[in-house]
Amino acid sequence: MFIGVISIFSYKFISKEYKEEINKKYEDEIKNMSKEDLKVVNEVISLAKDREGQEYTWGGKGEIVTKERLKELIDCYGESYYPLDKKDYIGKQGFDCSGLTYWTYKTVTGVNIGYSTIEQQEVLKDYKVDIKDIKPGDLIFTTRHVVMYMGRGKIIHSASRNPYPIGGIKTGSIKYFTTGQVYRPISYINLVKTKK
């Protein structure tokens, strides 16, 4: 009984310190961001978080999946890419990993950052940053996958074809993506908007 009480107090003490450390890290992450950039990035992240729990749809770019669209996708990529019951796709927005990042940035800013992971890396090639300088809204690319950094050591992504919560749109830790390449879409978007 006494050991349990000590464990609870220790956990609360560590949790408070950890929370303070995470909040300090976030303050450092956003320190050099303009208010305008932070506002846009927060809207993008919020839009992605609003989709948390939705299932992964290979080839989905944010469109509502109809029976016809699902048939097109299956004809293009193959039945094995759509392992869930068809009703789990139809009538819902469809997102694969790059579809989520494409759609959120396009919806908030009106700027197309590319559809696929390859296209996004090509479009953003001049905006690569070191992982040590990562900021909210940055995209981390690993082999054929992309995640969005939310800040405070967290990411959001359309993870895999497995049913949610194993797959689908979910949040997680950056620790599994620290070897990826980081790009900053907001810098590209700002350039595009100044040219208009």
Where are these regions (language model features)?
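Sec-dependent N-terminal signal peptides of Gram-negative exported proteins
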Residues: 1-16
